[in-house]
UniProtKB/Swiss-Prot annotation:
Regulation: Can be converted from the dehydrogenase form (D) to the oxidase form (O) irreversibly by proteolysis or reversibly through the oxidation of sulfhydryl groups.
Record protein name field: Xanthine dehydrogenase/oxidase
Residue stretches making up the 2Fe-2S ferredoxin-type domain: 4-91
Enzyme class label: oxidoreductase
InterPro entries noted in UniProt: 2Fe-2S-bd, 2Fe-2S-bd_dom_sf, 2Fe-2S_ferredoxin-like_sf, 2Fe-2S_ferredoxin-type, 2Fe2S_fd_BS, Ald_Oxase/Xan_DH_a/b, Ald_Oxase/Xan_DH_a/b_sf, Ald_Oxase/xanthine_DH-like
Main subcellular location of this protein, as a coarse class: other
Taxonomic source organism: Rattus norvegicus (Rat)
Catalytic activity, as annotated: xanthine + NAD(+) + H2O = urate + NADH + H(+); hypoxanthine + NAD(+) + H2O = xanthine + NADH + H(+); xanthine + O2 + H2O = urate + H2O2
NCBIfam families attached to this UniProt entry: xanthine_xdhA
High-level lineage: Eukaryota, Metazoa, Chordata, Craniata, Vertebrata
Family per record: Belongs to the xanthine dehydrogenase family.
Amino acids binding substrate: 802, 880, 914, 1010
Modifications after synthesis and translation: Subject to partial proteolysis; this alters the enzyme from the dehydrogenase form (D) to the oxidase form (O).
């Protein structure tokens, strides 16, 4: 049977594909076939939004053109027949930016830029549907988009200028409702704006591209069945119900796909293959919406976005009593997923997928929704009850049946309904527990006639509490019923200690908490229905427990110092210059590694990794791999021409030989003609193992004495004397979990052999060109000078590409050497997370001695980190943790020790802060316990113990230019700390089940590589005869704005406009022997190198300037050229006077320190563990800022990354050492809605730093730790909750990091948690272990 042609439009151009493969996604087609690389691959599972595009089609049922956003990484091209696709390239370019592109660029909303095109397209789609959106609609548009760099504030602030309801004016003062005016401090004068909205192009909806007329002409043409055949899969697009039922009768195993949001993931990540896929999306009956007498019936193919809009309309016009169920469904849909998923995911698919943690199925089950099932010749209606899901991922449907529709019922008089969900993150997250709850009372009474309590996340399917609910019938809605239900649920809803998903006590407690919320909500509604006399009055302190999550309108302030009035307009230092690549990033023109056009004879590589934590390799079978079309070769350690040993300490291998030491250890690599064939072949490689004992956790390592190197120690004073003189001594321990970098662009390399003298060129996404070069050269057995490494830009790095990127690059270089052809590999997100390691988990055991006044006199901390299977940078990271164990406090008698645990996990590595945040969190943890034990305000104890100017640290470095007290006092004042503390106490008295916390935290962060010789930077400056300047330096651009700052430095040094200066890339053949772009020091080191090179040029131009004092610049340059004077210069800088000895505790490890203070307020839900970040005020000393926009962006971005570290991001490993959390669906980084509602950042004024270029300071890492103010505010709120339930206010309790909903809920001990205590049998292995 012949296949049909696929016809669709992309950016107005017609595309006819004669060989459409159902396995090809729109993303792959756009990038590889059409060369449209603006759309990015961030995760491949619809979780990050980097691949967002807009789809436009004529909707025959609504009789209109509709526009909606989709994830191109999940959309099969076969689903796009007769639609129009718009990508970021289709709406504007750098010659003429669309207003959406312009505003994100000019409001500084693009740092690394990898997420930017997807965010642009989400906003563009909103504006196509709603040219004048509200602020809330704008925020909701980004629920399916993630950004790891910016902290989201500048994106939202830029796009709020489109809003009709008080769009931000950016501080221009033209808006009477301006957020800055509303919250303006009296203590500091307002800065100029970071951007001026008046400069923005207005949005003109009439100028948008039209829907293709050819597609519009087809609207009345009957749709016909289509067939597309790929290499392994056939896709049939059914156009009528009859065709569909016939197909299902003939092929009962055929998969029905509408949005591909589930099947696509199963095929990609679970290696499932469905040879026949049938798409029923066109069938009218499956898309119909029917308003019946008992409810609204939705066809099974109706997208969830349509369900949402229909129910919203009904809720607006129907009586409240009739829409109880509708509002429950809407509450679940609110947090269900991003717009991209809801636009295509069908209501029927959501039901039939039968997920045990479905958001919607418990709601449908509790509501008694009716399902209509049809097959050829039969039709039946069933109620969705406990029998509908007979087992894991199973339904009552017969193989030949399909779901035709679902009827969501109207609620009756006396019926109440609520829906609940708790996840790690509110937006776009998989639930831990979901629930639908319904009660129907006998008319005019509070006696229960029907009660339905349904749950997801409590079994292998959606369940109903069938033992508990019948016992409540005919009971009155009162305290007695509450106790009965809670006892019943605790008994009925048991979970095994090793239940998949873990968090057993938390999940069990949530079922009771949800019912308690439902009980209170119903009680409240009964009171409004004049039944208060029967049921009793709701305690007013309980009322807030019934409130659904509401977010106040955001308010943001950014304060910075203006440049001097006499500064030349051409001198851009100190001005908020946008990132130089922002326009290219916003238009999709910025080129990342995988965007480089493919070579004609290019091959693709996929890694083959270990599935065991520690084992001998007994055999490798490649026979199945070789059968895959396009297979070229399989590489192992035997193929390495020179040295298989690699890594910073030669303790790693290019490929594992004989033995593997972690899950994810690279054993070999498959090379094939396409990425898809390479991946299939890699999965076909079968490896057998002989398991060896594995060490997974820090505790395992301690028990087995498994460490790297000797103990590291810093000691000062007389510890014994200090403890003996102390009034109080407190001991304890703190565990700090690891963190995944989650740069949006995964590791990527293209290796191109040059065919002579062993030369090779590598295009790499790396922070470390030098080590990439030397590791490849060593592996191949050639001198470094034969290997050129080039980096244009990275889509984020954060330390994750400092050393670990080399494991990919080295394998690629071997493949290119072996085949003699260019080879490319961009890791999939799950591979990247599995292989590359992350932030080190820490365990600290501390003992602190202090006086009754709160003065700390003695401290001892033993630090243990989980280093993983190789040493990598673990020792330097532990050293920095010890250097920062004091944070900002003078402790006369102190000892800090550090051990790095050698475990069978992927090697952990550098991550923004480099051990500093772990050391400082421990310091603030015991400091908070000192304050509690003394009964003193924490802020007083912190201030009392703080260093002063000229003090020596515990490692004997003198503090000079110590601005921290200024930052502290300014933050106390600008945050109105003392007044707000009283307000928090008042709120906590008035609310039993919601509590607020407030905390202020300082940071002191040392700037320099602690390995002295790394503190060097270089630059190369070429001046061309037209006066243009090409600048190269040793640092790489990963979104932090380094290139922009270097151009600003060169501009001031040469006294020419920034427009004359260009940076193309970083490469080993321009600036050699570079230090990694890390340690926050790159602007300092390379900036000074740039300055030196520019000075050399200026000296050479001096004679020509004297001859022509008025210039212009171009004349001096031409005169120098014609006089045969070199117009090329290098510059070099090394940081002076560095070097510390652990043996003698002397010398300076740091050139200077950066300081900052943050005050944060949170509100926790004691029943669910949920929290919201109400407000954060930050005062940061960045010296004389080179670029306030970039520096504020770094402060906000680092803070939000720290927010993830301390409250949200949690890695789950199995007891066998296998990572569970391998993508955005299971690993949650902060989203748009996670940031503080009020976010106020102030750069300290008048604090020039004499030790760095143009008096600036480092900013990349220091602000991250300030997010611990959120952690400690949460702990403050938990303490208030525990005090309410009988805990002594001075009683200490352990709260490990991150403070996830699970930890918050479990710490808020109450009558519900005590019912759900779950013992763990001795030999039971839990689902995940604390590594």
């Amino acid at each position: 049977m012949t296949a049909d042609e696929l016809v669709f439009f992309v950016n107005g151009k017609k595309v006819v594909e004669k060989n459409a493969d159902p396995e090809t996604t729109l993303l792959v087609y756009l990038r590889r076939k059409l060369g449209l690389c603006g759309t990015k691959l961030g995760c491949g599972e619809g979780g990050c939004g980097a691949c967002t595009v807009m789809i436009s089609k004529y909707d025959r049922l609504q009789n209109k053109i509709v526009h909606f956003s989709v994830n191109a990484c999940l959309a099969p091209i076969c689903s796009l027949h007769h639609v129009a696709v718009t990508t970021v390239e289709g709406i504007g370019n750098t010659q003429k930016l669309h207003p959406v592109q312009e505003r994100i660029a000019r409001s500084h909303g693009s740092q690394c830029g990898f997420c930017t095109p997807g965010i642009v397209m989400s906003m563009y789609t909103l504006l196509r549907n709603q040219p004048e959106p509200t602020v809330e609609e704008i925020e909701n548009a980004f629920q399916g988009n993630l950004c790891r760099c910016t902290g989201y504030r500048p994106i939202l602030q830029g796009f709020r200028t489109f809003a009709k309801d008080g769009g931000c004016c950016g501080g221009s003062g033209n808006n009477p409702n301006c957020c800055m005016n509303q919250t303006k401090d009296q203590t500091v004068s307002l800065s100029p704006s970071l951007f001026n909205p008046e400069d923005f192009k207005p949005l003109d909806p009439t100028q948008e591209p039209i829907f293709p007329p050819e597609l519009l002409r087809l609207k009345d043409t009957p749709q016909k069945k289509l067939r597309f055949e790929g290499e392994r899969v056939t896709w049939i697009q059914a156009s009528t119900m009859e065709e569909l039922l016939d197909l299902k009768a003939q092929h009962p195993d055929a998969k029905l796909v509408v949005g591909n949001t589930e099947i696509g993931i199963e095929m990609k990540f679970k290696n499932m293959l469905f040879p026949l896929i049938v798409c029923p999306a066109w069938i009218p009956e499956l898309n119909s919406v029917v308003h019946g007498p008992e409810g609204i019936s939705f066809g099974a193919s109706c997208p969830l976005s349509l369900v949402e809009s229909v129910l919203a309309e009904e809720i607006a016009k129907l009586p409240e009593q009739k829409t109880e169920v509708f509002r429950g469904v809407m509450e679940q849909l609110r947090w269900f997923a991003g717009k991209q998923v809801k636009s295509v995911a069908s209501i029927g698919g959501n039901i039939i997928t039968a997920s045990p943690i479905s958001d919607l199925n418990p709601v449908f089950m509790a509501s008694g929704a009716k399902l209509t099932l049809v097959s050829r010749g039969t039709r039946r209606t069933v109620r969705m009850d406990h029998t509908f899901f007979p087992g894991y991922r199973k339904t009552l449907l017969r193989p030949e049946e399909i779901l035709l529709s679902i009827e969501i019922p109207y609620s009756k008089e006396g019926e109440f309904f609520s829906a609940f969900k708790q996840a790690s993150r509110r937006e776009d997250d998989i639930a831990k527990v979901t629930s639908g709850m319904r009660v129907l009372f006998k008319p005019g009474t509070i006696e229960v006639q029907e009660l339905s309590l349904c749950f997801g996340g409590m079994a292998d399917r959606t369940i109903s509490a069938l033992k508990t609910t019948p016992k409540q019938l005919s009971k009155s809605w009162n305290e007695e019923l509450l106790q009965s239900v809670c006892a019943g649920l605790a008994e009925e809803l048991q979970l095994a200690p090793d239940a998949p998903g873990g968090m057993v006590e938390f999940r069990r407690t949530l079922t009771l908490s949800f019912f308690f919320k439902f009980y209170l909500t119903v009680l409240q509604k009964l009171g409004r229905a004049d039944l208060e006399d029967m049921c009793g009055k709701l305690d007013p302190t309980f009322a807030s427990a019934t409130l659904l999550f509401q977010k106040d309108p955001p308010a943001n302030v950014q304060l910075f110092q203006e440049v001097p009035k006499d500064q030349s307009e051409e001198d851009m230092v100190g001005r908020p210059l946008p990132h130089l690549a922002a326009n290219m990033q916003a238009s999709g023109e910025a080129v990342y590694c995988d965007d480089i056009p493919r070579y004609e004879n290019e091959l693709s590589l996929r890694l083959v990794t270990s599935t065991r934590a520690h084992a001998k390799i007994t055999s490798i079978d490649t026979s199945e791999a070789k059968k895959v079309p396009g297979f070229v070769c399989f590489l192992t350690a035997e193929d390495v021409p020179n040295s298989n040993a690699t890594g910073l300490f030669n303790d790693e291998t290019v490929f594992a030989k004989d033995e593997v030491t972690c899950v994810g250890h690279i054993i070999g690599a498959v090379v094939a003609d396409t990425p898809e064939h390479a991946q299939r072949a890699a999965r076909g490689v079968k490896i057998t193992y002989e398991d060896l004992p594995a060490i997974i956790t820090i505790q395992d390592a301690i028990n087995n004495n498994s460490f790297y190197g000797s103990e590291i120690k810093i000691e000062k004073g007389d510890l014994k004397k200090g403890f003996s003189e102390a009034d109080n001594v407190v001991s304890g321990e703190l565990y700090i979990g690891g963190q995944e970098h989650f740069y949006l662009e995964t590791n990527c390399t293209i290796a191109v052999p040059k065919g002579e003298a062993g030369e090779m060129e590598l295009f790499v996404s790396t922070q470390n060109t030098m080590k990439t070069q030397s590791f490849v050269a060593k592996m191949l057995g050639v001198p470094d000078n034969r290997i050129v490494v080039r980096v244009k830009r990275m889509g984020g790095g954060f330390g994750g590409k400092e050393t670990r990127s080399t494991v990919v690059s080295t394998a690629l270089a071997l493949a290119a050497h072996k085949t003699g052809r260019p080879v490319r590999c961009m890791l999939d997100r799950d591979e990247d997370m599995l292989i590359t390691g992350g932030r080190h988990p820490f365990l600290a055991k501390y003992k602190v001695g202090f006086m009754k006044t709160g003065t700390v006199v003695a401290l001892e901390v033993a630090h243990f980190s989980n280093g993983g299977n190789t040493e990598d940078l673990s020792r330097s990271i532990m050293e920095r943790a010890l250097f920062h164990m004091d944070n900002a406090y003078k402790i006369p008698n102190i000892r800090g020790t550090g051990r790095i645990c050698k475990t069978n996990l992927p090697s952990n590595t550098a991550f923004r802060g480099f051990g500093g945040p772990q050391g400082m969190l421990i310091a603030e943890y015991w400091m908070s316990e000192v304050a509690i034990t003394c009964g003193l305000p924490a802020e007083e104890v912190r201030r009392k113990n703080m260093y002063k100017e000229g003090d020596l640290t515990h490692f004997n470095q003198k503090l000079e230019g110590f601005t921290l007290p200024r930052c502290w006092d300014e933050c106390i004042a600008s945050s109105q700390y003392l007044a707000r503390k009283r307000e928090v106490e008042k709120f906590n008295r008035e609310n039993c089940w919601k509590k607020r916390g407030l905390c202020i935290i300082p940071t002191k962060f040392g700037i320099s590589f602690t390995l002295p010789f790394l503190n060097q930077g270089g630059a190369l400056v070429h001046v061309y005869t037209d006066g243009s300047v090409l600048l190269t330096h040793g640092g790489t651009e990963m979104g932090q704005g380094l290139h922009t700052k270097m151009v600003q430095v060169a501009s001031r040094a040469l006294k020419i406009p920034t427009s004359k200066i260009h940076i193309s890339e970083t490469s080993t053949n321009t600036v050699p022997n570079t230090s990694p772009t890390a340690a926050s020091a790159s602007a300092d080191l390379n900036g000074q190198g740039v300055y030196e090179a520019c000075q050399t040029i200026l000296k050479r131009l001096e004679p020509f300037k004297k001859k022509k004092p008025t210039g212009p610049w171009e004349a001096w340059v031409m005169d120098a050229y014609t006089s045969a004077v070199s117009l090329s210069a290098t510059g070099f800088y090394k940081t002076p006077n560095l070097g510390y000895s652990f043996e003698t505790n002397s010398g300076n490890p740091f050139h200077y320190f950066s300081y900052g203070v943050a005050c944060s307020e949170v509100e926790i839900d004691c029943l669910t563990g949920d929290h919201k970040n109400l407000r954060t005020d930050i005062v940061m000393d960045v010296g004389s800022s080179l670029n306030p926009a970039i520096d504020i962006g770094q402060v906000e971005g680092a803070f939000v990354q720290g927010l993830g570290l301390f409250t949200m991001e949690e890695l789950h490993y199995s007891p066998e050492g296998s990572l569970h959390t391998r993508g955005p669906s299971t690993y949650k980084i902060p989203a748009f809605g996670s940031i503080p509602i009020e976010f106020r950042v102030s750069l300290l004024r008048d604090c020039p730093n004499k030790r760095a270029i143009y008096a600036s300071k480092a900013v990349g890492e220091p602000p991250l730790f300030l997010a611990s103010s959120i952690f400690f505010a949460i702990k403050d709120a938990i303490r208030a909750a525990r005090a309410q339930h009988g805990d002594n206010a001075k009683q200490l309790f352990q709260l490990d990091s991150p403070a996830t909903p699970e930890k918050i809920r479990n710490a808020c001990v109450d009558q519900f948690t005590t019912l759900c205590v779950t013992g763990v049998p001795e030999n039971c292995k839990s689902w995940s272990v604390r590594i």
